[in-house]
A protein has these predicted regions:
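Conserved acidic residues
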Residues: 55, 76-77, 119
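Short mixed-charge
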Residues: 22-42
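SDR active-site strand-loop-helix element
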Residues: 6, 42, 79-85, 121-127
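N-terminal Rossmann NAD(P)H-binding glycine-rich loop of SDR-like oxidoreductase domains
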Residues: 1-29
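NAD(P)H-binding glycine-rich loop region in Rossmannoid oxidoreductase-like domains
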Residues: 59-100, 132
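Short loop/helix-cap segments at secondary-structure boundaries that form the rim of catalytic
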Residues: 46-54
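Conserved Rossmann-fold NAD(P)-dependent oxidoreductase catalytic core, especially the SDR/UDP-sugar
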Residues: 106-136
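Adenine-nucleotide cofactor-binding loop residues
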Residues: 40, 45-46, 63
Length: 136
């Protein structure tokens, strides 16, 4: 089983990778435990702190279709999509927020669709998606 973690150098990406390495298996599409052969950590900066032959660190832009095609192939079975621009940065640079959080996600989903089988995609978000307090 090959696993991809976008945002792999971030806090959640590194924690998830460490937990997956510790477990050593993940459920496949048939809900059977399968051995994890490789975890690719894909991010704008290298993911540091791993000394395990199952870890493959790839730097690149989640907005780049060619970079996505290099990390999502016919052997990719699971994609944890954690790459995102956080709310405060997205509020300061609205175009960047749209580009990464919407356009890049769509490109990632499209790349998964094009590989001939559809890898399982797990998308994470945060409490920030709910916005602020509701008006009275």
């Amino acid at each position: 089983m090959k696993v991809l973690i976008t945002g792999g150098a971030g806090f959640l990406g590194r924690r998830l990778a460490a937990k997956l390495l510790q477990r050593g298996t993940l459920k496949n599409a048939e809900l059977r435990e399968e051995k994890i052969e490789q975890i690719t950590l894909f991010d704008m900066v290298p993911a540091l702190g791993f000394n395990d032959p199952r870890i493959n660190v790839v730097t690149g832009d989640v907005n780049d279709p060619e970079a996505l095609a290099k990390v999502i192939d016919t052997e990719t079975t699971s994609v944890f999509h954690l790459a995102a621009v956080v709310s405060s940065q997205a509020e300061d640079d609205f175009d960047l927020g749209l580009s990464v959080n919407i356009d890049a996600s769509r490109r990632l989903f499209e790349t998964c669709r094009k590989v001939g089988h559809c890898p399982k995609v797990i998308f994470a978000s945060s409490l920030a998606v709910y916005g602020g307090a509701l008006p009275e």
